[in-house]
Amino acid sequence: MMIKPKQRILSAAETGAAAACCRTSPDQEESHVFEQIRNFAIGALGAAMLAGAPQAHADGLPGLRGHDHTGITVPDIKQATDFFVNVLGCKSVMSFGPFSDDKTTFMHDLLNVDPKSVIHQITLVRCGYGSSIELFQYSAPDQKNMTPKNSDIGGHHIAFYVDDIKAAKDYLDSKGVKTFFTLPVKEGPAAGQTITYFLAPWGLQMEIISYPQGMAYEKTSPIKLWSPTDPGK
């Protein structure tokens, strides 16, 4: 991700240069931010090139290797990071920001947000095996504060694989986390999995899932879903 630091105004030529090579600024603090982003981009590219996973179908996105991360906008990034780290047990890897540009359409052109939007902070966390989670705290003139339900267009949830659903649910309950009904799936291609939904303190929908004996679809499908129980496949 290439995002211009707060109060930094780029010309069209500078924007192109920054996107191409993460150009540093003479200002020390600004240079440090760009260095973080440059290193992140180079690391991600190197990981993709060296990964041993098979490439996607030839008719798909060229060079596709897999799901790198999911971005989630939260109302309070300190609260969100605390929940992911101290309740769920994820690891906070890096944070950077703020970013804004209230003089041009840079933020809209890059991220499809209001041009006067501000990203106050970005924090990336890693939760065991699997893709990373990127947390954003924004402010914007047109910001909506309604969290979508699973039934809404754009509704979403994050699911975590656990070894023991009951133990995980009991733990969440002990932490005061809102949990829902536990469902063991016994029919259909998903038979073998057990799920429980829960809510983060700010309303983000999440799930714990377990299928220690696998799922029914695996007996007939030539393609297997990725699973943190066997991350190499």
Describe each region flagged by the PLM:
Residues 7-9, 27-42:
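Bacterial N-terminal signal peptides that target proteins for export
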Residues 10-20:
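Intrinsic, low-complexity polybasic segments
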Residues 21-22, 56-63, 67-75, 94-95, 121-137, 146-172, 194-199, ...:
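Vicinal oxygen chelate
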Residues 41-52:
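Bacterial N-terminal signal peptides
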Residues 62, 73-130, 167, 174, ...:
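Core segments of cupin and vicinal oxygen chelate
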Residues 100, 140, 212-214:
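A short acidic/small-residue loop/turn micro-motif
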